[in-house]
């Protein structure tokens, strides 16, 4: 049998593991697949999307991640996902959420930052875009 790549799991540094797990679970409705605080690690899953959370990150690691790395999550029916999570995003601090909008390159997206400022972009091809 030939080897196959079956997924990729970004490892996101977080300052407080419990806070981050709660955010991904309660705001984005990810399922907690692994919660190992003694190992400063958790994994959250929703459909095919997986994110590893690495707890105990220092300020330098958080700043480097926040300023240089983002996760792009491909979505089917962006509007349905937005309707699902928007009520839970209403209480987030200003600047943490950008509602759905159309990029000039033919993709619709919304943006969301986790408690440590890690940027997640949720997007799908705009069906109204001319080929």
Regions picked out by a protein language model, each given a short descriptive name:
Residues 1-19, 69-71, 124-131:
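N-terminal beta-strand motif that seeds the catalytic metal site of vicinal oxygen chelate
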Residues 15-18, 71-116:
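Vicinal oxygen chelate
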Residues 29-34, 95:
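Short secondary-structure junctions
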Residues 18-31:
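Amphipathic alpha-helical segments
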Residues 32-66, 119-124:
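Conserved short beta-strand elements that form part of the metal-binding/catalytic scaffold
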Residues 15, 47-49, 57, 75-78, ...:
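Short loop segments at secondary-structure junctions
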């Amino acid at each position: 049998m030939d080897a196959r790549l079956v997924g990729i799991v970004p490892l996101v540094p977080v300052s407080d593991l419990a806070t981050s797990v709660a955010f991904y679970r309660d705001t984005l409705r990810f399922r907690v697949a692994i919660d190992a605080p003694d190992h400063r690690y958790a994994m959250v899953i929703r459909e095919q999307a997986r994110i590893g959370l690495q707890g105990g990150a220092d300020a330098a690691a958080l700043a480097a991640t926040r300023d240089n790395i983002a996760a792009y999550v491909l979505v089917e029916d962006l509007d349905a996902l937005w309707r699902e999570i928007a009520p839970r995003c209403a209480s987030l601090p200003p600047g943490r959420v950008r509602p759905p909008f159309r990029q000039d390159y033919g993709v619709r997206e919304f943006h969301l930052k986790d408690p440590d400022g890690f940027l997640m972009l949720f997007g799908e091809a705009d069906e109204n875009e001319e080929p």
